[in-house]
Regions:
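Intrinsic-disorder/low-complexity regions
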Residues: 1, 22-24, 276
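Transmembrane alpha-helices
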Residues: 13-19, 97-99
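Membrane-interface motif at the C-terminal end of an N-terminal transmembrane signal
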Residues: 18-40
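Aromatic-Pro/Gly-enriched surface loop or interdomain linker
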Residues: 32-168, 227, 233, 238-241, ...
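N-terminal Sec-pathway targeting helices
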Residues: 1-16
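Helical hinge/lid and interdomain linker segments adjacent to catalytic or ligand-binding clefts
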Residues: 136-212
Length: 287
């Protein structure tokens, strides 16, 4: 073998090695923060509209037109702090080492052609698998308003993904706040329920078990929510069963944080009213 042939052969080996490294150890998908997700989702909400709330509100052009026509808005509402009420917000901001878990998997479950199309009979079991969680929607079903309010007040956030990939992350925080984290993995369930100070801001959390495929960023329902038939609470979690009925109280007129063995549980679903209820928000920091 002459010198030139050796160089070509060596170069070929190097190329093959690089190819194998890249394909067998692909670059991890860069994790996106809740703040970045909120900014992306509400990028079209640029029209400020006066209101009687303690927060500024922004709408899309389409929703302003619909509002003027007395039609229901379609694009949610973006909430921001008001420069005129900064002193008020100081009473609502977190005062200890607290983390909130944004339910990105639950958002995916409620998406079009997702789990709920199967539950309603509009789709077969294909709607229970390969459901993408790459573009979460900050809607009522995924605690969209609650997420916004807590985020702008300065609460720290992680997502379901962070907990599933690194369950020990919760050990870094004194208090863990759950939203409508209805669909979780077994690893998530174990890590969350092992924590000593939980605040459940939503009934129906930790209800059904999913499996996550990080190669294509999708989820699949394993069991729970009457799948297969007869399996409602996938984890037989007594706390969820105790508070499940409160899921349908979205006015929270008689709200109360009820003490459980490792924290507190709210007795209503606050996402439709939390932006009106500063007393409830203030109570969170004291638990």
């Amino acid at each position: 073998m002459n010198k030139f042939t050796k160089i070509i052969s060596f170069g070929t080996v190097v190329i093959i090695v690089i190819f194998l490294i890249v394909n067998l150890n692909p670059e991890p998908v860069e994790e996106i923060t809740v703040g970045e997700l909120l900014k992306k989702y509400f990028s079209s909400h640029v029209i400020k509209k006066s209101n009687n709330l303690d927060f500024d509100t922004y709408f899309t052009k389409n929703d302003i037109i619909r509002h003027n026509q007395k039609l229901q808005i379609q694009d949610e509402v973006r909430f921001e702090l008001s420069s005129e009420k900064l002193e008020l917000y100081e009473k609502l901001k977190p005062n200890k080492n607290t983390i909130v878990i944004y339910p990105i998997f639950t958002s995916a479950a409620y998406s079009d052609n997702g789990f709920y199309d199967y539950y309603s009979g509009d789709c077969d079991e294909s709607c229970l698998k390969d459901i993408s969680f790459e573009n979460p929607e900050f809607t009522y079903d995924s605690s969209g308003i609650t997420t916004q309010i807590l985020h702008i007040l300065g609460y720290d956030f992680i997502t379901d993904i962070d907990v599933d990939k690194n369950p020990k992350i919760l050990q870094n925080y004194e208090t863990v706040i759950l939203l409508h984290n209805e669909y979780v993995t077994q690893k998530m369930f174990d890590a969350i329920t092992a924590h000593t100070n939980l605040i459940f801001l939503s009934p129906n959390a930790l209800y059904a078990e999913i499996e996550v495929n990080y190669d294509n960023n999708t989820i699949e329902l394993i069991h729970g929510h009457d799948y297969p038939p007869g399996v409602s609470n996938a984890f037989d979690y007594e706390i969820e069963e105790q508070f499940h009925e409160y899921e349908y109280d979205n006015e929270c007129l008689e709200w109360e944080f009820i003490e459980i063995k490792n924290g507190y549980h709210l007795n209503c679903y606050p996402d439709g009213s939390i932006h009106y209820n500063l007393e409830l928000i203030a109570k969170i920091k004291d638990l």
